[in-house]
Amino acid sequence: MYAIGKVYIYCIKLYAQGVCIMVQFISRRKADFGKAALFVALYACINICLVSLLKEGLYLHGLKGILSGGVIFALAGHFWNYRKRFLAIYAGMMLFLSAGLIIKLIDHVAVGGGEFLGNISLASTIWGSILLVWLCIENAAALTGKIKAGRIISSAWLFISLAILAVPNLVLWGYFALSQHYLRPDIVMTIYQTNKDEAIAYLMSQNPFYIGLAVAAFLLISVLIFKAAYTVCVTDRPSFASTPHGWLGILPMIVLLALGLKTTYAAKEYEPAHIVLSVRDSVKSYTMFAQNKEKRIQRLNALGTLPVLPGHKGIYVLVIGESETRNHMSAYGYQRETTPWLTQFAKEPGTLLFKNPYSNHTHTVPVLTYALSEKNQYNQVPLAKAYSLIEIANAAGFDTYWISNQERYGAWDTPVAEIASTAKHQVWLNGEVGTNIKTAYLDEELPIKTPDLKNVDNALVVFHLMGEHTTYADRYPAVYQKFDEAGTKRDEYDNAVLYTDFVLSRIYDLVKDNPHFQGLVYFSDHGEEPDLGKGHESTKFTNQMSRIPFVVHFSDSYRSANPALFETLKGQENDYWTNDLVYNFMTEIMGIQFLPINEPNLTLGNPAYDRTKDNIRTLHGERKIES
């Protein structure tokens, strides 16, 4: 304790000496102090003017953060004598370190005043602090005679700190060069969940010019950053002071200024930090969902078997499509005949072709995590505590099947894999764990590989297709290459849609004659934009990416037993709906009672359903639907 006390007292003395040096500096060099104050004021005015222009009105919030960043800037500027080249490089580094903010503005993404000032002030503080710490190391080495060691340490500090800060901002600029859009956290999450072959397929689908542009931008900016650091720290190397304690006193002052900034702006205001923290929270949420599986099952077991309404027990088939947009389906009015079977199927008395279904996101994992659980865009249920459709079906006494042509990626798509893992019967055509999207089987193998259902009288059977997943040409056999007018991605996509239509017919044929068959439901996880080559990236969002098919067919026996429910659904065929409400819909038509939560206003088939074009959302609540 005595030693700690001595260190503590020494630190206080050190800081006091630093303050004394600064006071002496102010009293003896009033001209320099006046110049520094002028630069702080100028810095603050520029920031206030910029954010006021952005907000279209005088914006005076966050002044403490602005001043903290300004003081760091002025302090660094003093030691470099406010040289024009230093100021130009300082401004350039601030712009670079504010990459996320600038790209958002270019991409017309809404930016708040606090977010704007937070990024600018943090960028100034980061760059200024790097320089001042480097200067302290160099000066301490000069005063102690440890020139060589000091040079190594200061160079390591400069290189490591710049590399750590440069990489995320370079990624932001690189992605912008590739896609002309801002990098959203969900894109990073998708990359985290993407395997090697899927990444290669994505790159191959991009314009080679933009790939080259992204690589060139990455290399050029990297060179410019380290050139700027070399210019500031070597070419324009400042002279050193002769008072060690004064120099070391700068360090706690930097810390205090940084703390002052932190009390004004949270770290998540800085765009790279915001992305990292958002991804971390998503991963944590998905991990907790997996870890809480046993707890959810125990809670359901404590409730006993969930009752099912009379006339509802039987076999239900849920088919999950992949990347299919209804804009390319002739059943929904597309000019090419891509869905001949579905077009005829829609005319049958038991079939409902919903006209306004939308996806809740444009990426598979977030879509299905919501679609197959209690969690949706409109409630506050924590994902970790949300029961899945499979868990509820098990608790209601249904036999559950998960039959997939997508590989069980394990770590890459934990929530979907966890939901599937609770099914009593699982068939993974491409194995339990995989690292590519080059499936060994086409989707038509799914009904062939399905366990025999002849002696099954009460079940939920889920099929997960590869559908129109990129690369489109890999999703169908040569015999389905019907559209090849120009050899475009559109032709390949339409061929894949045509093949999916055939697969749906085969799945229906598998169950239609089973006396216990009750209904078949088909929806796609999200849409696709093959016409513009944008795929389904949320940063490149178009309405077509969210426009999905939603088709339901009920057997004669189901309609006879539940005429009111069927008529209600028929009357809702034109209603707006998002596929995060699949859980609600399936539990409704399966007649499962005493659910952990009831949301009649979010449940198709319930007369209280109240979703409209004005109140449905996509991208997990971020975006309104535009039909």
Where are the regions a protein language model picked out?
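Membrane-proximal envelope and lipid/glycan-remodeling enzymes
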Residues: 93, 104-127, 164, 173-175, ...
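Hydrophobic, well-ordered secondary-structure elements that form the walls
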Residues: 504, 525, 550, 582, ...
